[in-house]
C-alpha cells in the first residue's frame, strides 16, 4: 500500500474508488433512459436495474443530506425505508463540484469546477462558480467580459434529454448564471415553499407525456453549516422533507430518486491560514473550499511552503502534492482534461476530523460561526444515500 493510501486510512478518510457505485454513474444511468449516449459500465447497469420504469421521474438533490443523516432517522421513516444503498459522491465533496458532475455526468477531472472557489489559469482570476463572480471584489464575471461558456466547459446534458424536462430551483437562485447553465429558461421553474413543489409535481404527473424533473433542495446544508449536523433545527427540517416526500408519493406512475451532493461533519476547531506568511508565495488565492484547499505556489517557494505548512498545521491538516492525488485517481477514473488539471494548484490540503480552514483574509466573517462543513474525505462527507421510491407500489 502506498504512502498516500496509508495516510488516508490512518485519518479515517474515504479513499475514493469510482469502481464502486457513485453519483456520476447514477446520473449516466438516468440520462440513458432519455437517449443520452454515455459510458456504460457495471455501475450504470446496476443503477438501471434499480430504477422503476414509470412515466415520470423526479430526481431530488437535497444539499448536505448525507447517509449519516438518513441512517439516524426512525426505522419507519419513508426515506430510510426506501434507501437502496450507500454510494459515494465525487471529491472534492463540495456543492459546485458535485452539482456540475450531476448535470454533465462527468467527474471533476473532466469538468474542472473544483469547489466554491475556483482559479482559472487562462483568465488569471479567482472566482466563485455558483455566484459567477470575482472572489475578491464580488464583481459579476460578465462585467469583465467573461462568458459562462469560458468557465463551464462541459455542457449540461439536461438540455438534450429526449423528454419533457423540468428543473425546480428555489426562487433566490432560479435566475442565476449557473442555473441558466444547468437548463434553459423555458424548462426552469422557481418555488417559494414546499407547497409550490407539491402543486407543481401534481400538475406535471397529470400530463400524458413522460417527464424528467430535477428538484434542488438547499435547506439542510445551510442549517448544518449554521447549527451542526445533530441540531434540532436540522432534524426538524428533515421531518418537513419527509412530509414533502409523503405528499409527492400521492402521485402515481412516478419514480422518486432522492440523494445528496455530499454530507457534512461537525466542526469543533477553526484553523486560520496564515496569509501574512504565505501571501508572497501565492500566485493565486487558495481554491476549492474550507475543508479541502488547493494552493498555487510560485516557482522557487515550493520547498519553503511545504516545510512551513507541515510544521504549522501538522495537527490539523494533511498536505499533499496535487500530482499524488491525481495519480491515485481521487478526482475521477484517470481521464484528466488538461484544462481541469491546469486550474488546480501545486498542493492540496485536507482538514482532519472536525477541523475547518479559514483560507480567507476576512477571518472575522467566519471565525466561530461554522458548526458543520464538508469538501473533505470523511465518511460523513463522502457517503450519500440512494433512495428510490416507486409510487405505484406500497411505500
List each language-model region with its residue ranges.
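Feature captures the catalytic ectodomains and active-site-proximal regions of enzymes
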Residues: 1-395
Amino acid at each position: 500500500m502506498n504512502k498516500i493510501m496509508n495516510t488516508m486510512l490512518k485519518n479515517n478518510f474515504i479513499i475514493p474508488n469510482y469502481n464502486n457505485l457513485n453519483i456520476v454513474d447514477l446520473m449516466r444511468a438516468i440520462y440513458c433512459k432519455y437517449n443520452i449516449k454515455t459510458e456504460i459500465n457495471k455501475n450504470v447497469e446496476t443503477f438501471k436495474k434499480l430504477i422503476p420504469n414509470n412515466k415520470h421521474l423526479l430526481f431530488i438533490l437535497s444539499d448536505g443530506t448525507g447517509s449519516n443523516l438518513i441512517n439516524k432517522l426512525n426505522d419507519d421513516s419513508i426515506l430510510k425505508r426506501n434507501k437502496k444503498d450507500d454510494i459515494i459522491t465525487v471529491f472534492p465533496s463540495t456543492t459546485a463540484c458535485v452539482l456540475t458532475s450531476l448535470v454533465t455526468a462527468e467527474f471533476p477531472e473532466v469538468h474542472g469546477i473544483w469547489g466554491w472557489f475556483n482559479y482559472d489559469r487562462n483568465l488569471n482570476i479567482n472566482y466563485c462558480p455558483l455566484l459567477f463572480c470575482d472572489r475578491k471584489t464580488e464583481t459579476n464575471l460578465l462585467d469583465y467580459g467573461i462568458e459562462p461558456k469560458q468557465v463551464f466547459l462541459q455542457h449540461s446534458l439536461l438540455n438534450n434529454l429526449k423528454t419533457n424536462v423540468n428543473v425546480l430551483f428555489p426562487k433566490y437562485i432560479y435566475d442565476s448564471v449557473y442555473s441558466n447553465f444547468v437548463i434553459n429558461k423555458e424548462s426552469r421553474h422557481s418555488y417559494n415553499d414546499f407547497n409550490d413543489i407539491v402543486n407543481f409535481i401534481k400538475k406535471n404527473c397529470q400530463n400524458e407525456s413522460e417527464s424528467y424533473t430535477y428538484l434542488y433542495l438547499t435547506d439542510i446544508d445551510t442549517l448544518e453549516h449554521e447549527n451542526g449536523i445533530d441540531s434540532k433545527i436540522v432534524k426538524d427540517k428533515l421531518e418537513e422533507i419527509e412530509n414533502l416526500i409523503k405528499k409527492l408519493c400521492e402521485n402515481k406512475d412516478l419514480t422518486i430518486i432522492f440523494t445528496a451532493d455530499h454530507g457534512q461533519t461537525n466542526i469543533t476547531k477553526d484553523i486560520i491560514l496564515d496569509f501574512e506568511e504565505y501571501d508572497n508565495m501565492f500566485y493565486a488565492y487558495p481554491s476549492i473550499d474550507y475543508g479541502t484547499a488547493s494552493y498555487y505556489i510560485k516557482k522557487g517557494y515550493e520547498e519553503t511552503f511545504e516545510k512551513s505548512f507541515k510544521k504549522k498545521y501538522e495537527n490539523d491538516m494533511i498536505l499533499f502534492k496535487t500530482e499524488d492525488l491525481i495519480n491515485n485517481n481521487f478526482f475521477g477514473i484517470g481521464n484528466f482534461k488538461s484544462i481541469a488539471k491546469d486550474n488546480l494548484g501545486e498542493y492540496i490540503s485536507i482538514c482532519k476530523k472536525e477541523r475547518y480552514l479559514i483560507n480567507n483574509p476576512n477571518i472575522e466573517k467566519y471565525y466561530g460561526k461554522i458548526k458543520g462543513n464538508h469538501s473533505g474525505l470523511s465518511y460523513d462527507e463522502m457517503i450519500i444515500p440512494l433512495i428510490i421510491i416507486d409510487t405505484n407500489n406500497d411505500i
